[in-house]
Structure formats: C-alpha cells, structure tokens
Amino acid sequence: FVHCDLQEVNLCDANLYTCKFILCCGLETAIVNDKTLYYRPQCPMNGSFIGYKGAWCYDPELHIRPVLVTLEIPADAYRSSATTRKCRCDKAIVLDAYTLSNGQQLPNTVPIHSAYDGCFVYTIGQTLQVVDCNTNRWDECSTGIHFFMEEEDARWWIESWINAYVL
C-alpha cells in the first residue's frame, strides 16, 4: 500500500502478513488486540536491547561481502516496527560485526556499509544517530536505522539483498 488513505477501510479478517504500508494515513487508530498479529511492535518499547542488522563491506579484493552487525539500541532511542519483523530506531551503538561467509569478526577499522545508503557507515564502538528518523511507525521503509530482533532475520535479509542487487 503506497500513499493510501485507510481511514475508512475495514481490514477485519484481512491477512496483511506480507503487506507494507508506505506513506499511508489513517493507521493511527488501528485496533491492537490478539487478532492483529504483527501490529504490536516487534521490539521492546522500553529499556535497551540487542538488534541485528544486515550490511556489507569490501573484502581485500574489493568484492562486496555480506556482514551481520550487532547493535545495542539504547533505552533513550526511538524504536518502532510496522506490520513485519523489520524494526527501526533513531540511535544505536555498534557492538560488533562479522562476515556471513566465514564468521570472521571484523576489526573496527573496516567500514561497514548500509545496504540502502552505502554512505551510511557502521563503525564498531561508535554510536550512530539519525536526526531525521521518521516517527510514524507505519512508514516501515522510512528514515532510521533498520534492524531485526533475530539474527536469522537479519542474515536472511542481507543475503537476499546481495543476491538481488549485487550478484
């Protein structure tokens, strides 16, 4: 759903498992209960926690390699999720990163790039902040630091991205 006005729409009994809502209005009053699976945030709304991000780096031969980044989302960070398992935040601490091919931990001197914006670099030990993070939780693919709660989801996502856009 892109640029949709959903204010008068009845989505009862609709399976929205794979749907994305991009720049839609009218979702602010969505009913959240046991029947609206995935409407509840996928990440904790309080406290700090660990998240995982798929990213990439160059190997010594300048080939693009998928990387799994471990992030700490601090207690004061904005965080959200829409209707899928993908989450977003405005601040994260980069704890570590390793290559998916051999599990090698990367040193903090290796630039790790966002798949969406190659100029957005993750450096181990640094705190990143996105000042213009979109706080509309239903705008899933908007500005912010994207991550998953489960390592397996981040791994699958970056492998899919590499296969679709690089190989």
Predicted regions and their residues:
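Extended catalytic/binding region for NAD+/ADP-ribose chemistry, centered on the ART fold
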Residues: 137-158
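Tandem repeat scaffolds
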Residues: 1-63, 79
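Short aromatic-glycine-(Arg/Gly/Cys) micro-motifs in beta-strand/loop hairpins
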Residues: 117-140
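Intrinsically disordered, low-complexity regulatory segments
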Residues: 11, 136, 162-167
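Residue-level detector of bioactive/disordered segments in secreted/extracellular proteins
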Residues: 6, 21, 26, 89-91, ...
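Conserved mixed alpha/beta catalytic, RNA-binding, or beta-rich assembly cores of soluble enzyme
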Residues: 39-112, 120, 136, 145-146
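Extended, small-residue-rich solenoid/repeat segments and analogous flexible loops
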Residues: 1-7, 154, 160-165
